[in-house]
Amino acid sequence: MSFDGRAYRYSGPGTLSAGPLEVRLANQSPVALDSFWLVIGKLLHGRTLADVQAVIRSGTATRVPAWFKVAGIFPAAPYAQPAWGVSLAPGRYALVCQRVRDGALYALTTVTIR
């Protein structure tokens, strides 16, 4: 699974096998202090990416919703290309990016783990 922090874009399959995964990040932002975190969260109770987007759009979230179980938070410093490991159980997961300099959140996509 790969994420490009400059374009806020996930590249990879929509369905992956359960178990250990490598998460590759690429922070090629032209802004020197523009680090980000990629957050992977399991969506519970039939929630979808639209629900995540609605929380972000509301601008009032002060905590993670109970239906979004954080499975991993992966930082990428400016100009870095780190690789992280995570083990995911079956389910549907949302990928969310948070830009560190201003806290802006971007709901990117969902990935199904089988």
Residue ranges and their predicted role:
Residues 43, 61-70:
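Short amphipathic beta-strand segments in non-cytosolic proteins
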